[in-house]
Each structure stands twice: as structure tokens, then as C-alpha cells.
């Protein structure tokens, strides 16, 4: 059974398929089309947003047997070998495990040999910021005047740790985190292609908790599919992410705003028994209060993904409470979240934050 995880199956194979990096894709594609090819590229950004994918696409574009192109054919031997990770002229190096200067010199000594069957030897150095100072010095000498048949693509999640002298010798591209909306649309597209049932609210939750990373979103989606036995629904997503179930956001916020201490404590005990993390309680209440506040301040155009029940809960609390109380509640809970790490325990921190709201409003 040759099952491919979603992150690999849906890895972009053309520059045009890359999500959320239009400014970078356009610059690289135009450079390839015009024949303005640099000897080194540096890609920086958080995890799972396309650095390695762009690096491999560059390797394919430079070595495609149909010529240097921004649109590799994927049919020639070189393209196929690069996609399978079998091309001997594309050398992927993990900077985190090859930090010693001796190892870097050994690698750099090989650059003077001609490519075996490709147009260029392409060195992809991932997590390049992990290299030692001496390794950077060795790399710098090569980056200054590399052989014509050699190209470098460097990738990092921490560009501040890379010497300025290295950066100045590369075409530097800073990748952006992917917007929640773009991740949501991509997940929806994948599930349609995979013929998997879902609801948009579940995908929105996954997109939010991916924190701008496509790879993280796909891994969460994979988990949700397995948990739901081939389906994705909000209950499984809520359980998987350890989120506060929607109904408790309403009940807890309502109890606090009604200054009902007893009900508040009973609800907290109930919520803790289902395994929700204490900080998550404050996060979900803050998000709920945000929606209440915006619905009070201006006519809110509700997103289609919100359930009718959720909208009704928001509107009910918004109509029955003063704007100042909602704002004060938000401020106290926000400060409570900041102070959570200083509390004797997270349980005590959350309880005291809610009791502080009840005393203040």
C-alpha cells in the first residue's frame, strides 16, 4: 500500500501552485524566463510555508532537459529524479546536523567536479543558520566566486543568525506566513479532490490553529480525517485541538457577565473534566468576547462558516450587556492570560481571572 501523506501528495510541483508567496514566485519565475540567473538564493521564513518546495522547484527549473525554465516539464529524467530525491546533482544538506567546518569543507571541495548529467550542481542547505562561524567563513569564500556550474539555495527559519556577508552575496527572499483564509480555501479544495466530507467551520478551526503554516495545516487535517474515520467534523476537530466546545464559550461568558460565581465555578469544573487546557478557556472566551464587542459596535457581516446557533448566542449576550462591561471583561481576561505563568497553577489563574471580572463589572 503506497499511501502518501497529504503534505507530500499536495506539495506544489510548479511555481504557480505555491500558495501565498506571489511576490517571490513572480521574481524567481521572471528571472528564470529572462535568463537572469543568480548563483545563490536565500529563503527565510517560518516552518511549513514553502522554503524547501521553492528550493526544489528551482533545482528542477535550472536542470530541466527542455532548457532553463520557470515551468519544468516533469517528464524528463532529470525532473523525475529531482522529484523522487534521486538526482545526484541536487545535494540536500541539513545545516543542523552538518555544523562542523570540516564537514562543510568536505562538501565544498566537491563543487569543482562537473555535474554528472545535469546542467548545474545545486546545493540546497536547509536550516543554514545552524552552521558554525567557521563553516560560514568557508561557505563565504565559495559564494564569492563559485564555479559556473554550481548554484546554492539556502533556507532558514532564523535569518538574524546568518552573517550579513552571506546575505549580501545571495538573492534574499523573505517568505510570508500564509493567511488563514488562503489555508482554509486550500484545505477545502483538497477535501473536495479527496472526496472527504467536512464542514467549513471545522476547516476554519484547523486553518486558525495552523498559525500560517501550510504543512501544519495539512498535518492537522490528516489527524482529523483519521480521528473521524474518513470524515472531518467539528466535534473531532475540537477534541483533537483540545479546544473549548462552542456551547461552553457561551455558557461560561454568560455566567460571568451575570455575576453568577457559583455557576461559573461549576462550569469550570465541568470543562476541566473533559480535558480542555486552562489557557485555552481564556483564549476561546477572548475570541467570543471579540465577536460580541464587534456586533455591539457596528453591524457585523457574519461569515458563512459560523453556525446559526453561534450567531444567536453572540447576539443574545450583545443585546443584554453594556459595551463597557464587555470591554472590561476582555481586558481583565487578556491580562489574566498574560499573568497565567505567574499563578500557583493555571487552574487558579483562570479561576481568579473570572472572579476578578465578576467583582469588577
UniProtKB/Swiss-Prot annotation:
GO BP annotations, alphabetical order: DNA-templated DNA replication
Substrates-to-products reaction catalysed: DNA(n) + a 2'-deoxyribonucleoside 5'-triphosphate = DNA(n+1) + diphosphate
Entry keywords, A to Z: ATP-binding, DNA replication, DNA-directed DNA polymerase, Metal-binding, Nucleotide-binding, Nucleotidyltransferase, Transferase, Zinc
Gene Ontology CC: one annotated term: DNA polymerase III complex
GO molecular function, one term: DNA-directed DNA polymerase activity
A Pfam family matched in the record: DNA_pol3_delta2
Annotated Zn(2+) binding sites: 64, 73, 76, 79
EC number: 2.7.7.7
Keyword Chloroplast: no
Residues noted as binding ATP in the record, renumbered to the chain: 45-52
Database matches in SMART domains: AAA (SM00382)
Primary role: DNA polymerase III is a complex, multichain enzyme responsible for most of the replicative synthesis in bacteria. This DNA polymerase also exhibits 3' to 5' exonuclease activity.
UniProt-listed PANTHER family: PROTEIN STICHEL-LIKE 2, REPLICATION FACTOR C / DNA POLYMERASE III GAMMA-TAU SUBUNIT
Similarity comment: family membership: Belongs to the DnaX/STICHEL family.
Subunit-structure text: DNA polymerase III contains a core (composed of alpha, epsilon and theta chains) that associates with a tau subunit. This core dimerizes to form the POLIII' complex. PolIII' associates with the gamma complex (composed of gamma, delta, delta', psi and chi chains) and with the beta chain to form the complete DNA polymerase III complex.
Protein name: DNA polymerase III subunit gamma
Organism of provenance: Buchnera aphidicola subsp. Acyrthosiphon pisum (strain APS) (Acyrthosiphon pisum symbiotic bacterium)
Origin organism lineage: Bacteria, Pseudomonadati, Pseudomonadota, Gammaproteobacteria, Enterobacterales
The encoding gene: dnaX
Amino acid at each position: 500500500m503506497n499511501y502518501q501523506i497529504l503534505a507530500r501528495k499536495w506539495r506544489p510541483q510548479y511555481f504557480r501552485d505555491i500558495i501565498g508567496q506571489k511576490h517571490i514566485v513572480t521574481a524567481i519565475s521572471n528571472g528564470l524566463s529572462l535568463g537572469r540567473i543568480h548563483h545563490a538564493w536565500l529563503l527565510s521564513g517560518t516552518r511549513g510555508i514553502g522554503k524547501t518546495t521553492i528550493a526544489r522547484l528551482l533545482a528542477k527549473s535550472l536542470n530541466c532537459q527542455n532548457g532553463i525554465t520557470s515551468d519544468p516539464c516533469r517528464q524528463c529524467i532529470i525532473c523525475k529524479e529531482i522529484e523522487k530525491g534521486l538526482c545526484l546533482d541536487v545535494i540536500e544538506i541539513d545545516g543542523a546536523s552538518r555544523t562542523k567546518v570540516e564537514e562543510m569543507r568536505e562538501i565544498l571541495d566537491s563543487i569543482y567536479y562537473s555535474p554528472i548529467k545535469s546542467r548545474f550542481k545545486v546545493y540546497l542547505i536547509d536550516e543554514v543558520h545552524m552552521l558554525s562561524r567557521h563553516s560560514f567563513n568557508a561557505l563565504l569564500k565559495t559564494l564569492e566566486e563559485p564555479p559556473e556550474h554550481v548554484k546554492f539555495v539556502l533556507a532558514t527559519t532564523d535569518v538574524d543568525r546568518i552573517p550579513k556577508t552571506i546575505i549580501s552575496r545571495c538573492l534574499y527572499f523573505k517568505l510570508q506566513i500564509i493567511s488563514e483564509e488562503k489555508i482554509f480555501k486550500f484545505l477545502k479544495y483538497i477535501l473536495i479532490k479527496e472526496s472527504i466530507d467536512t464542514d467549513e467551520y471545522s476547516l476554519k478551526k484547523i486553518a486558525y490553529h495552523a498559525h500560517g503554516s501550510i504543512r501544519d495545516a495539512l498535518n492537522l487535517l490528516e489527524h482529523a480525517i483519521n480521528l473521524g474515520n474518513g470524515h472531518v467534523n467539528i466535534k473531532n476537530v475540537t477534541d483533537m485541538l483540545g479546544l473549548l466546545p462552542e456551547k461552553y464559550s457561551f455558557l461560561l461568558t454568560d455566567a460571568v457577565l451575570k455575576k453568577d460565581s457559583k455557576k461559573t465555578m461549576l462550569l469550570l469544573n465541568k470543562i476541566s473534566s473533559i480535558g480542555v487546557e486552562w489557557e485555552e478557556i481564556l483564549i476561546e472566551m477572548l475570541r467570543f468576547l471579540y465577536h460580541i464587542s464587534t456586533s455591539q459596535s457596528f453591524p457585523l457581516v457574519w461569515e458563512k462558516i459560523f453556525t446559526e446557533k453561534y450567531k444567536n448566542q453572540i447576539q443574545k449576550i450583545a443585546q443584554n450587556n453594556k459595551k463597557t462591561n464587555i470591554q472590561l471583561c476582555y481586558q481583565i481576561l487578556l491580562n489574566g492570560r498574560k499573568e497565567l505563568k505567574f499563578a500557583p497553577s493555571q487552574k487558579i489563574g483562570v479561576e481568579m481571572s473570572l472572579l476578578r471580572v465578576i467583582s469588577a463589572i
